[in-house]
Amino acid sequence: ELEELIPRYLENRRADVEIARVAFARGDMERLRSLGHTIKGTGASYGFTAISEIGYSLERAAANADAEAAGAAISNLERYLNALVIVYVDE
């Protein structure tokens, strides 16, 4: 069930923020593009469309070598993850 998978998924996205910060500091736009692509592809699968949208923003920014937008996407992902509260509802 997703309920069992979501905590690990979110841990991985938090790790991605750190990976992205290192890549950003190195100016590694290809790594940021690839990471953004991965984030974009996984977010919606877990019900986090906002994560997918942020991943898309990071992917596009890095593909266009737009460091300012890439940095903003990384910050947005970190803020989103820090503000996220998960509530499971029995149906």
Give the predicted meaning of each segment.
Residues E1-T38, S45, N64, E68-E91:
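Long, amphipathic alpha-helical coiled-coil segments characteristic
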Residues I54-A63:
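Hydrophobic, amphipathic alpha-helical faces that serve as interaction scaffolds
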